UniProtKB/Swiss-Prot annotation:
GO cellular component, one term: extracellular region
Signal peptide boundaries: 1-21
Organism: Bacillus phage SPbeta (Bacillus phage SPBc2)
Protein name per the record: Protein AimP
Coiled-coil ranges (or none): none
BP terms from Gene Ontology: latency-replication decision
Gene: aimP
Keyword field: Latency-replication decision, Secreted, Signal
Length: 41
């Protein structure tokens, strides 16, 4: 049971860091559009 809880905690930490990185990329995508790259790339 403890391993399952640890796995959930690790997945949760990875998920939140991925979401925050994704939002940072979306905020910076305006700069990429100026450089000719499509939004969300």
């Amino acid at each position: 049971m403890k391993k399952l809880i640890m796995a959930l905690v690790i997945l949760g930490a990875l998920g939140t860091s991925y979401i925050s990185a994704d939002s940072s990329i979306q905020q910076a995508s305006g700069d990429y559009e100026v450089a000719g790259m499509p939004r969300g790339a």
